[in-house]
């Protein structure tokens, strides 16, 4: 509604010189095959030509593109040759970290970004990184290369989480099955929060090791209990995070 005169216009140079009045519209994006997260964004229409996304964050993997970015849903099918990082994000009180943004970097370069769903589940899916050579040792003749099966990459992790930015009126109940469309620009504009290595939130987590051919599932260590010193570390089902302060 509101674009009737525009849709019947000639669309030529003279038409655009008359500066047809613009109105704000909310666009909702949903994938029936559940490959990508649902979201919404506001756009001023009409626009001349193809609409160009104007709010791609700095250092985005898509920084040279003007298309609207989409982010994988946890239910997306994984294709060959792709690396996967998963997490189920929670605050200390057990509240799902809905719409939190997780970023992974390797050697300072952003390799993937994901947005959590309303239950805090998130996945980053990206092409497998280039194989790494082992560092040179002395003498140089003893230098070796890591075999393909032993390849791994140390990723730097950042969480962007500012739940108050998504205040809706009225709020959608957590148990509701109604589809929710978080504002994409707001999601990407969230400030940096904290990732916790342990459930007691005494140690922050900033890195994780991705191994070739294996999904990396990020989880916080469970609280320590009396057990033999050589017992295996117990992990929670969740990766605990805190909002930006």
Annotate the PLM regions.
Residues 1-10, 109-131:
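Short, acidic Ser/Thr/Gly-rich low-complexity loop/linker segments typical of extracellular
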Residues 23-33, 133-141, 150-163:
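A short, solvent-exposed beta-strand micro-motif common in secreted/extracellular proteins
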Residues 1-56:
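N-terminal accessory interaction module
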Residues 14-16, 111-114, 144-145:
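Beta-strand-rich interaction surfaces with strong enrichment in secreted/lumenal proteins
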Residues 93-107:
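Short, ordered, surface-exposed loop/turn motifs in non-cytosolic proteins
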Residues 34-62, 164-223:
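Structured interaction patches on ligand/partner-binding surfaces of diverse proteins
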Residues 24, 84, 98-101, 154-156:
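Exposed beta-strand and adjacent loop surfaces of beta-rich binding modules
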Residues 49-84, 90-95, 114, 217-244:
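Beta-strand-rich domain onsets/edges
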């Amino acid at each position: 509604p509101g674009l009737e005169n525009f849709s019947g216009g000639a669309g030529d140079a003279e038409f655009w010189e008359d500066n047809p009045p613009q109105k704000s519209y909310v666009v909702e994006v949903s994938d029936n095959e559940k490959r990508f997260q649902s979201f919404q964004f506001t756009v001023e229409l009409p626009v001349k030509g193809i609409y160009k996304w104007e709010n791609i964050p700095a250092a985005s993997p898509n920084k040279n593109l003007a298309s609207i970015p989409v982010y994988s849903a946890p239910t997306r099918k994984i294709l060959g040759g792709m690396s996967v990082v998963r997490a189920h994000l929670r605050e200390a009180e057990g509240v799902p970290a809905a719409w939190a943004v997780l970023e992974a970097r390797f050697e300072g370069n952003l390799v993937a970004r994901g947005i959590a769903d309303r239950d805090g589940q998130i996945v980053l899916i990206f092409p497998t990184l280039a194989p790494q050579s082992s560092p040179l040792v002395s003498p140089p003749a003893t230098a070796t290369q890591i075999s393909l099966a032993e390849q791994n990459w140390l990723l730097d992790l950042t969480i962007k989480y500012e739940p108050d930015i998504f205040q809706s009126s009225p709020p959608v109940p957590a148990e509701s099955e109604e589809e929710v469309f978080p504002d994409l620009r707001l999601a990407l504009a969230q400030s940096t929060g904290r990732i916790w290595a342990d459930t007691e939130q005494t140690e922050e987590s900033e890195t994780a090791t991705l191994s070739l051919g294996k999904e990396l599932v990020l989880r916080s260590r469970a609280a320590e209990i009396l057990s033999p010193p050589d017992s295996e570390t117990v992990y929670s089902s969740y990766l605990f995070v805190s909002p930006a302060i």
